[in-house]
Structures are given as C-alpha cells and as structure tokens.
Amino acid sequence: MGRPPCCEKIGVKKGPWTPEEDIILVSYIQEHGPGNWRSVPTHTGLRRCSKSCRLRWTNYLRPGIKRGNFTEHEEKTIVHLQALLGNRWAAIASYLPERTDNDIKNYWNTHLKKKLKKINESGEEDNDGVSSSNTSSQKNHQSTNKGQWERRLQTDINMAKQALCEALSLDKPSSTLSSSSSLPTPVITQQNIRNFSSALLDRCYDPSSSSSSTTTTTTSNTTNPYPSGVYASSAENIARLLQDFMKDTPKALTLSSSSPVSETGPLTAAVSEEGGEGFEQSFFSFNSMDETQNLTQETSFFHDQVIKPEITMDQDHGLISQGSLSLFEKWLFDEQSHEMVGMALAGQEGMF
C-alpha cells in the first residue's frame, strides 16, 4: 500500500498559510538555510508537513521571486521546455529561477496552452492559405510562362513573316530592275553565241553548195567528228577560229600570191602555141604577161577572201572538205583563162 501522506496524520494543519507561519518559516530558513525539510516542522513548532513547508518556501517565501506578467522570452522558454519535458514543472522552473513552478504551471494552463492552440490553428490556416496561395501562384506563374511563351512564339512567327515579306519585296524590285536593264543591253551567254554563230554560218554558206559536196563529205565524215554542213558552235570554237584566222592570214596571202603565177604559166604557153610567127608570139606573150600580172592581183584578193575561212575552218574542224575547194578553184581559173584567150584573139585580129 505504501507510505500514507504526511498531511493525513493526526494534528497536521491543512489550508492556507497564515502570516505568522510564514514569518516563523522564513526566520528558520535564514538561520539554518533551505534543506532537511523533514526536521523543519519539529524545530519550528509548525503544525505543517515538510512538503508544505518546502513548497511554501520555494513558491512564495524565498527571495528573488518575480511576480507579474511573463515576458515573451519566458513564454518561448516555457513552450520549448514543455515540448521537451512535458508537465515536469519543477524541472522547467529550474531554468527560470525568478519564476516558481506553480506560477509556471498556472500560467501554462490558463494562458499559454490556449494561446499556443490558437497559434497552431492560425498557423494551419496560414499554411493552408500559403499552400493555396502557393498553388495559385504556381498556376499563375505557369499560366504567365505559357502566355509569355505563346507571345514569344507569336512574335517569332510575325518576325519570320515580316522577314519573308521584306525578302520578297527586295526580290521583286531587283528582278524588275534586272529585267528592265536586260532589255536595252545584250547579255553575252553561251546560248547567244551559239545562235549568233549558227546565223553567221547560214549567211556565209549556200545550201546549194552542200549538195555538190556530198560526195566529198561522205569521205570526210569518217575522219572528222563533224560533217561539212554542221558547225559545232561554242565559245571555245569561235575563239579558236578567230585565233587561227589571225595566225593564218600571212599564209593565205603567200598561197594566193604564189598560186596564180604557177597556174597562169601554162596559159601563156597555150596561147603562144596557137600563134604562128615569132613576133606575134613575143608580142602576145608580152601582153599576156601584163594581163596575167593584173589577173594575179585581182585573183589574189579573191583568194584572200575565199581561202582564209576555208583553210582555218578546215584546220580546226574540217567543216569544208578539200574537194569542194579544188572544184571552186578550177571553175574560177577556167573561167578566167577563157576570158583571157578571148582577149588575146581580139587583140590579134586588131593587129592584122
């Protein structure tokens, strides 16, 4: 069953302390000091138990006890210690020497407990409000981010459209300018060179001459990559043609100047055989020499114009065969020889 409480003993007084009892207890503790609380009732003659004497001294009579309202620091300390130690008020009061355990307990039960409950409730509300505000702010932030992204995308699209329109607007005037500038000024291209060369060849060569040289072109086609009537028109061929034409002009002149003299030689011999007398032969030969000199000057000019393109073209691509050139020369010189014979006979008739 344990030891019975001391207050239940016979002759032990209960209830509040009187001022006289307080004075006796304070005078004894000042003389002997606080301690050995079991001997205090017997030495002082107080009809109180030892526990009642200790609590009366600790909570009310000892010096340095602070009365009145608790400060904010004391409240925080009490709340913190109560959370750590629980309802052990004496241990909590040891950390606050100016406050008694009874005062701390009473203040906790009457004020701090209710205040802390309100703070927790308001904190929960605040947390709910903060969480709701956080969620709403997050939603707003997401929506703002989304709106900013959409606006940025729209601006990028608008900028791309504007750049495209500017590029097209720049292309249009440039194209119109190029078209307007290309009208008055000719543009040198490979196609234009081909057209020009084909038109030039069509003007220079007669289609009827191609029919007469069909026999010679069949043989020349086997050796030359291009037929006599076809000209491979390109910038390179025209450049080569011009270069070879400039190089071959002295050759053509030498050929034209030398060939008529050799070919007119048999003409004078033939005319001399037809004559009978030596004087007539010498006179005719003298006249014929003068005429042949004039003819050589005239024929050299024709040879320069005829042989130049044919020799150069034949050296480059073999476009006009050698047979057609020889036929043309024979026809030309035969016609000149007949005219020359007629002129000589007319001169003889005048003399005789």
Swiss-Prot record:
Protein name in the entry: Transcription factor MYB96
Comp. bias intervals (Polar residues): 129-147
Ranges of Low complexity composition bias in the record: 208-224
Induction: Induced by drought stress, salt stress and abscisic acid (ABA). Induced by infection with the cauliflower mosaic virus (CaMV). Induced by cold stress.
Assembly with partners or alone: Interacts with HDA15.
Reported tissue expression: Expressed in leaves, flowers, guard cells and lateral root primordia.
Disordered as annotated region, ranges: 119-148, 207-228
Traits of the deletion mutant: No visible phenotype under normal growth conditions, but mutant plants exhibit increased susceptibility to drought stress.
GO BP annotation list: abscisic acid-activated signaling pathway; defense response; positive regulation of abscisic acid-activated signaling pathway; positive regulation of DNA-templated transcription; positive regulation of wax biosynthetic process; regulation of abscisic acid biosynthetic process; regulation of abscisic acid-activated signaling pathway; regulation of DNA-templated transcription
CC annotations in GO: nucleus
SMART domains documented for this protein: SANT
InterPro entries: Homeodomain-like_sf, Myb_dom, Myb_TF_plants, SANT/Myb
UniProt KW keywords: Abscisic acid signaling pathway, Activator, DNA-binding, Nucleus, Plant defense, Repeat, Stress response, Transcription, Transcription regulation
